[in-house]
């Protein structure tokens, strides 16, 4: 019997704040809010998309595609395992990202029903995975120390 490693998708997400320090969140098909970002592309032969060379490259590309925002990946915030559906696990990686286009309204891709900007005090009441809330709280805490 040969060894077959578990293969989980890796989703790289951004905590991105606009010029008013509001965090950008996207509303998904599960009726949850989530951080923008997406899957690490492994490239051919598994698909037609070119491979991402780093997690930072992934999050920067995904933000452009999903929201139209240009960002620069900064500090790695967290990694955690999320099970959006029974038996389906995803490795989530979150980054603190600097928005290079902070005055640009976010676009909404076909993957989400809407995009909204939330103030820090609004985040705890939102329906979203706790891992995202931890990452958002970490960014706000770090920025208060600056």
Indicate residue ranges for each PLM-predicted region:
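A structural signal for short, well-ordered beta-strand segments
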Residues: 14, 76, 95-97
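A short coil-to-beta-strand element that immediately follows conserved catalytic motifs
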Residues: 69-79
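Active-site-adjacent beta-strand/loop module that shapes the phosphate/pyrophosphate-binding cleft
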Residues: 9, 80-104, 116, 139, ...
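Conserved Nudix-box catalytic region and its N-terminal flanking loop in Nudix hydrolases
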Residues: 18-65
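NUDIX/MutT-family hydrolases
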Residues: 96, 106-139
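Conserved N-terminal beta-strand and adjoining loop/helix that marks the start
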Residues: 1-23, 79
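Conserved hydrophobic "DFG−1" position in protein kinase catalytic cores
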Residues: 16-17, 25, 97-99, 117
């Amino acid at each position: 019997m040969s060894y077959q490693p578990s293969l989980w998708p890796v989703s790289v997400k951004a905590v991105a704040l606009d010029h008013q320090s509001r965090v950008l969140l996207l509303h998904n098909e599960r009726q949850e809010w989530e951080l923008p970002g997406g899957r690490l592309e492994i490239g051919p032969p598994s698909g037609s998309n070119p491979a991402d060379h780093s997690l930072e490259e992934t999050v920067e590309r995904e933000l452009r595609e999903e929201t139209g925002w240009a960002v620069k990946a900064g500090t790695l915030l967290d990694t955690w395992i999320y099970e959006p559906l029974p038996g389906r696990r995803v490795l989530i990686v979150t980054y603190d990202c600097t928005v290079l286009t902070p005055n640009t309204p976010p676009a909404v891709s076909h993957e989400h029903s809407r995009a909204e900007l939330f103030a820090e005090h609004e985040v705890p009441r939102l329906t979203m995975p706790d891992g995202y809330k931890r990452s958002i709280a970490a960014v706000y805490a770090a920025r208060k120390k600056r």
